[in-house]
Each structure stands twice: as C-alpha cells, then as structure tokens.
Amino acid sequence: MGLIIKGKPVADAISETLIKEVDNFKIQGIIPKLVIIRVGAKASDLAYEKGILKRCNGIGIETYVKEFPEDISQREFIRELRRLNEDRNVDGIMVFRPLPKHLDENIIKYVITPEKDIDCFNPINLAKVIAGDSTGFAPCTPRAVMEILKYYNIDVEGKFSVVIGRSMIVGKPMSMLLLNENSTVTTCHSKTVHLDKICSQADILVAGIGKAEFIDSKYIKEGAVVIDVGINVDKYGKLCGDVDIKSCQWKNVIVTPVPGGVGTVTSSVLAQHVVEACKHKNKL
C-alpha cells in the first residue's frame, strides 16, 4: 500500500520557525518586506498570489502586489523593477512568470538584483545553485521538494534520482539541488527514449512533465519516493498532478499528492527566502 506524504506539515514547520525569526526582527525595528510583480490577471497567478499573501502575512512579512497592465512597455517594466532594486525597504522581489511575450525575459532577468531575487530569475542565482553556493536563492519549487525530503527524513545521498523535466524554473535546478546532496541524477525530457524504463529504476522520482496523470505504475518501482510537481486539470476539470496515484496505490511507494503536496510548501519557501534576504541586508 502506498504512503501519501502531504505538504502542510512541512509548510507549517517552516512557518513556525520563520514567525520566531520575524518576531526577533521586530524587536530590533526590522520588518521584512516582499513585493510581488504581476502583469495582467491570470487565474494561476492570482491563485498563487493569494497563497503567498496568506502565508507571508501570517508570518509577519509585509507583502505588497504591484499589478501592471498586460500592455506595459518593456522600458516601463524595467524602470519599475529598478525602482524596487533601489528601495532599501524592499527585501524580496517576486516576478510572476512567464511574462507576456513582448517583455523579453532574457533581458529582464539580468535587471533584478540577485540579493532580492527570491525565486532565482537572475542567472547569477542559478549559477550559485549549480555551484552549490548557499548564498544564492534556488527557485522555490525545487527548494520545496528538498524541504519535503528533509522533513520526512528521506536521504538522497547515494540514491538514483530521476527528474522529468528540464525547465529553468523546476527541472534543471531540481537536478542540481539533488546532485549537490550527493544523489546520482538523470534528467529526462520530452525527447528521452524509453522513459518508463529509466523512471522505473529511480529511487527518487521527481515528475514535472506537465501532463495530467501521465506517470502510472509502470514508471515507478517498489519502494520508490515519488514527488509530483505537476499542476494540471484532468478530464473532469479537477486539479491533478503528473502522477496517477490510483494506479500505484497497491505498490510500496511514497508519493506527494496534488493538490496538497509540493505547492503547499512553495509559499513557505518563498517566505523563507524573504527572511534570508532580510537577514543578509541587515547583517543579522
């Protein structure tokens, strides 16, 4: 019988620690501040924003949203981003991506200052992830995966890990974080041949393929740990992940659900990054 491990206990544990830290900051007259930059009003962005606001406000982090119209020019967007870079009261900046096509992310990602880039938009932070430099900010979703593994005492050292997906937001940094913890990592993608055979050898499988319930029992070996980072909608219109949990319920596996898994932890990790940025700025 499979074991489902949920994200809420992980998120709550992170938040509990952060609340104590922020309370200590306030005694010194310091209040961490996050600014969310959102262009337009996509449903997925609004849902994520709601979760961030709830989590950060509960911790004691001042959180503000800067909403821009979808037709904002690149020049104006960059000007606003630079203002936030220069604002000493702002500790963290979160840019919701992807941006509209007329806003060139390959240019904008170099504008955000790395010290405030709490979701690894600037390549400098990605380079730090690759180098195993803890002073950089990893993307929140891969970091949330690592927090889940840590909370449930799942050791990755020496294990064979397979990451499905090679995006800059999840797949590539996820592979690096696992590698930094001495896991042996294989990264798979849409062109990978014999995907099921590779996945079925994994001790730890991180699924970020972006296909609803695509990963079934033939991709998962007995005793594997399966972390589902997919967010999809099934044929009934319900939120689901990349893993078909029902198909592997009779296997001896550990799996995270969707919803209620990695996504639950992501907003707490983001808050953690804001607090870390605040500590760095104030030399705490």
Curated annotation (Swiss-Prot):
Q: Which InterPro entries match?
A: Aminoacid_DH-like_N_sf (IPR046346), NAD(P)-bd_dom_sf (IPR036291), THF_DH/CycHdrlase (IPR000672), THF_DH/CycHdrlase_cat_dom (IPR020630), THF_DH/CycHdrlase_NAD-bd_dom (IPR020631)
According to the UniProt entry, what is the EC number of this protein? 1.5.1.5, 3.5.4.9
Its Gene Ontology molecular function terms?
Answer: methenyltetrahydrofolate cyclohydrolase activity; methylenetetrahydrofolate dehydrogenase (NADP+) activity
Q: Which GO terms describe its cellular component?
A: cytosol
Q: In which pathway does it act?
A: One-carbon metabolism; tetrahydrofolate interconversion
Q: Which UniProt keywords apply?
A: Amino-acid biosynthesis, Histidine biosynthesis, Hydrolase, Methionine biosynthesis, Multifunctional enzyme, NADP, One-carbon metabolism, Oxidoreductase, Purine biosynthesis
| Catalyzed chemical reaction(s) | (6R)-5,10-methylene-5,6,7,8-tetrahydrofolate + NADP(+) = (6R)-5,10-methenyltetrahydrofolate + NADPH; (6R)-5,10-methenyltetrahydrofolate + H2O = (6R)-10-formyltetrahydrofolate + H(+)
- A Pfam match is THF_DHG_CYH
Has keyword Zinc? no
Q: Quick check: keyword tRNA processing in the entry?
A: no
Q: Which SUPFAM superfamilies match?
A: Aminoacid dehydrogenase-like, N-terminal domain (SSF53223), NAD(P)-binding Rossmann-fold domains (SSF51735)
Residues at which NADP(+) binds:
G165, R166, S167, S190, I231
Q: GO:BP terms for this protein?
A: L-histidine biosynthetic process; methionine biosynthetic process; purine nucleotide biosynthetic process; tetrahydrofolate interconversion
Q: What function does this protein fulfil?
A: Catalyzes the oxidation of 5,10-methylenetetrahydrofolate to 5,10-methenyltetrahydrofolate and then the hydrolysis of 5,10-methenyltetrahydrofolate to 10-formyltetrahydrofolate.
Q: Which family does it belong to?
A: Belongs to the tetrahydrofolate dehydrogenase/cyclohydrolase family.
Share what the entry says about its subunit structure, partners included. Answer: Homodimer.
This chain belongs to the protein called Bifunctional protein FolD
- State which gene encodes it: folD
